Amino acid sequence: MLTLARQQQRQNIRWLLCLSVLMLLALLLSLCAGELWILPGDWFSPRGELFVWQIRLPRTLAVLLVGAALAISGAVMQALFENPLAEPGLLGVSNGAGVGLIAAVLLGQGQLPNWALGLCAIAGALIITLILLRFARRHLSTSRLLLAGVALGIICSALMTWAIYFSTSVDLRQLMYWMMGGFGGVDWRQSWLMLALIPVLLWICCQSRPMNILALGEISARQLGLPLWFWRNVLVAATGWMVGVSVALAGAIGFIGLVIPHILRLCGLTDHRVLLPGCALAGASALLLADIVARLALAAAELPIGVVTATLGAPVFIWLLLKAGR
């Protein structure tokens, strides 16, 4: 038994090392890639200082943090709601951020700066999170809380559709493209949003024990003495914050929060002590690679990264499910 535990521990360490190497390689490739390829030897030249340090580095850091946040959010929600289909957009938090953004554009008549739009997106996500916490205080079951989140997401989606359909504003039509996901407008001015993600990411990665208990199910968690109401509130709030900041940075991006935790579980990473940091590394790597594809796929334009993640991720996910079912 001890030998099996040691073998599993060594395998987990190998997985984390491999994912760390993959993330570093994806990060280096992201800094080099573009219409103008700049190898590491030229990073400190005048051209490299402009393209690498001022344009590509903030974008790469944003992609890395958003990918980690979305993947961890997916892992947390799948454990919290005991549902393998749970992901960051399921509770309506992403759509809530979109409603906040569109309301800011309408009320500000397109004159608000980017930082104000980001704050409005975070505010929209947090409002939906507060509504969910209100439901949680009524001690609803996990399944009913999940259904409440789905209903809120549908309402927010309907509000966005009505606002965009009846609007003649060019800004709102551009926001529809933005809601498909993209990092094209990210620079060092959005560094405050990146910094807002780091403390929550680190904190959640340290909460493996309650996450492991939650994954056993609601009844088992109560029997083991876990304060379920407290952890449900805290984790919903943390997820809402991460998703709100991610939407403010890059728009709505699917696939990462749903598929990355699944892939790691299929690879044998079920302990949240390994799964949470593994999701951060794998989510960052996957989104970095998707961003590189989005930049290089078209010569004079950039694909929405949400389209890239869905196009590349869905077939891989289906293949993994078929492989696991054999």
Swiss-Prot record:
Gene: btuC
TM spans (from-to): 19-39, 61-81, 88-108, 112-132, 146-166, 184-204, 240-260, 274-294, 302-322
Localization, UniProt: Cell inner membrane
Pfam family, one: FecCD
Signal peptide: none
Subunit (UniProt): The complex is composed of two ATP-binding proteins (BtuD), two transmembrane proteins (BtuC) and a solute-binding protein (BtuF).
Gene3D superfamilies: ABC transporter involved in vitamin B12 uptake, BtuC
HAMAP family: BtuC (MF_01004)
Alphabetical keyword list: Cell inner membrane, Cell membrane, Membrane, Transmembrane, Transmembrane helix, Transport
One example of a Gene Ontology biological process annotation: cobalamin transport
Membrane disposition: Multi-pass membrane protein
Function recorded in the entry: Part of the ABC transporter complex BtuCDF involved in vitamin B12 import. Involved in the translocation of the substrate across the membrane.
Family from the record: Belongs to the binding-protein-dependent transport system permease family. FecCD subfamily.
GO CC, alphabetical: plasma membrane
Protein name listed in UniProt: Vitamin B12 import system permease protein BtuC
MF terms (GO), sorted A to Z: vitamin transmembrane transporter activity
InterPro entries in alphabetical order: ABC_BtuC-like, ABC_transptr_BtuC, ABC_transptr_permease_BtuC
Main localization, broad class: membrane
